[in-house]
Amino acid sequence: MKVLLVLTDAYSDCEKAITYAVNFSEKLGAELDILAVLEDVYNLERANVTFGLPFPPEIKEESKKRIERRLREVWEKLTGSTEIPGVEYRIGPLSEEVKKFVEGKGYELVVWACYPSAYLCKVIDGLNLASLIVK
C-alpha cells in the first residue's frame, strides 16, 4: 500500500492526520510519502507581485521550518524516532501541486491534514484517489 500525507501551511493542527499516516505505515507496512504544500506563501507572493511590493524570501524558509518543526515534534512523540520520511515541499495552489506530485506514483490513499472545505472537495474530486480528511 502506498500512502501520501498532505500537509498545508494554513493548518497547524496536524497531529491526528500524522497519527493516521504513522499507523498506516507501521501497522499495515504502507509506504509513506509526505507532501507539504505552502499555498499561503504562494498566495502572499502573488499578492505582493500584484501590488508591486517586495516579497521577503525568508517567509518561504520560515514556513518550511514551521511545518518541519511541527512534523518532527509529532513524529517523535508517536514513533520515538526523529527520522522522518522525506518531505517534499511545494509552493503553489494545493490542487495543482498535489495533482502534479501524485501523477504516476501509484498512491492508494491520500491522508489530508487540513480543514475540510468546498475547495478541498474539488481538489479531491480532481485526483480520483481514496482520501481521508483528518481535521
Curated annotation (Swiss-Prot):
InterPro entries: Rossmann-like_a/b/a_fold, UspA. It comes from Aquifex aeolicus (strain VF5). This is Universal stress protein Aq_178. It holds the Pfam family Usp. Belongs to the universal stress protein A family.
